[in-house]
Each structure stands twice: as structure tokens, then as C-alpha cells.
Amino acid sequence: MSLTLFAVYFVACACAGATGAIFSPGAWYDSLKKPSWVPPNWLFPVAWSTLYILMSISAARVSGLAMENELAVLGLAFWAVQIAVNTLWTPIFFGLHRLAGGMLVLVLLWLSVFATCVLFWSVDWLSGLMFVPYVIWVTVAGALNFSVWRLNPGEKPITL
């Protein structure tokens, strides 16, 4: 695995993660009704940091195989899609306070993460395996987003 490629992918992940500093949960999120099973606040940065490291390692490993495997190229394209979609969720949910919009983004994120996982697995099983915790975490995040959306009706419609 190339450390340079790892660094490139990790910078992309760090940019996605930086949206959490720009659009922090704050008082608005604290005021929302949440399900009893909501993970503790300290878990989110730990989970995302771990996932970003795993995502970067797996992408760097698959990148090393891209010259000889078309599925590796497709997997990396889906990796780029998922990190772009990942970057959208925080500004939509925490910045715009759009619970339904956040849910839509999470559905797209789950699909792109799952596709990346399957494609990476077909190229390098260890890289695919490193994406399994991400699939699980986005599944939990989707369930949490859906629950918060349902528990807090009355979201203002999006106006253009």
C-alpha cells in the first residue's frame, strides 16, 4: 500500500469530516426528540475517525490494483461518490436542519457505501472487509436519522 495514496484518500476523508466542525450539532440538535437507543455523543468522532482511516487504507490498497483490474477503477469511482455524499449530510442535517433531506442523503450514502464495499471485496477481500463497519455504521445512522425525523414532525418545507 502506498502511503502517498493513503494520505490523498485520508485528506479527502478529513475534508468530509471537517463539515462536522463547520456545522456542529449545537442547541438545535440537543432540543430534538431522539430514540432511547441513540449512541452517546463521544462515540461519533471515535467512530468516524476509525472509519475514515479504514476507508483510506482500503482505497489505497485498491488503487494499487487499478491498473490491472477494471472493477478496482469502478470501486474507486464509487468511493469518490460515497465521500462526496458523505460530505453533504452534515450541512443538510445540522446546517439546514432538514431531517428529511438528511434521510435522503443517508439513503444515497448507504447505497454508494454498499456498492463500494461489494466492488472492493471483489478486487481485494481485505479492502472490502474494511468497509463492512462503514456499512453497519451508516445503517445505524440511517435508522437514527429516520427515528429523529419521525419523532420531530413539522419540518419546514424546503423553499427555493
Swiss-Prot record:
Main localization, broad class: membrane
Protein name in UniProt: Protein CrtK
Any single Gene Ontology cellular-component annotation: plasma membrane
Entry-linked InterPro entries: TspO/MBR-related_sf, TspO_MBR
Location in the cell: Cell inner membrane
Gene: crtK
This protein's UniProt keywords: Carotenoid biosynthesis, Cell inner membrane, Cell membrane, Chlorophyll biosynthesis, Membrane, Photosynthesis, Transmembrane, Transmembrane helix
Pfam families found in the cross-reference section: TspO_MBR (PF03073)
Superkingdom classification of source: Bacteria
Family that this chain belongs to: Belongs to the TspO/BZRP family.
Any Gene Ontology biological process: carotenoid biosynthetic process
Transmembrane segments: 3-23, 37-57, 76-96, 101-121, 129-149
Topology in the lipid bilayer: Multi-pass membrane protein
Pathway(s) per entry: Carotenoid biosynthesis; spheroidene biosynthesis
Xref: PANTHER family: PERIPHERAL-TYPE BENZODIAZEPINE RECEPTOR (PTHR10057), TRANSLOCATOR PROTEIN (PTHR10057:SF0)
